């Protein structure tokens, strides 16, 4: 598996397709949108895991206290349950480095505070 330093450049358009097919059933990205099964991801970058107001996180997510940035997301999205044992997220992860890079590029654009 490619490390973050070896990750390909991300394509936000391709990442949006990945988000719509693999993430949108549980997450929203728009400011003010409510939580679904997973938390709203607006303002994700620079936020500490387990801290979105109004969402009931697992103790594992709160205790991990990772700051979400590109490298952390790249590693997390490979295998969420390995990165944060005990997370409630049921998504198995994205094995392809390009898919992870694309999704991160999309999230960086779509979750930035406006």
From Swiss-Prot:
The modification N6,N6,N6-trimethyllysine is found at residues 81, 95. It is found in: Mitochondrion intermembrane space. GO terms for molecular function: copper ion binding; electron transfer activity; heme binding. GO terms for biological process: gibberellic acid homeostasis. Pfam families: Cytochrom_C. The keyword Transport applies. Keywords: Acetylation, Electron transport, Heme, Iron, Metal-binding, Methylation, Mitochondrion, Respiratory chain, Transport. Heme c binds at residues 23, 26-27, 89. One of its GO terms (cellular component) is mitochondrion. Interacts with CCMH (via N-terminus). Interacts with CCMFN2. This is Cytochrome c-1. It comes from Arabidopsis thaliana (Mouse-ear cress). The gene is CYTC-1.
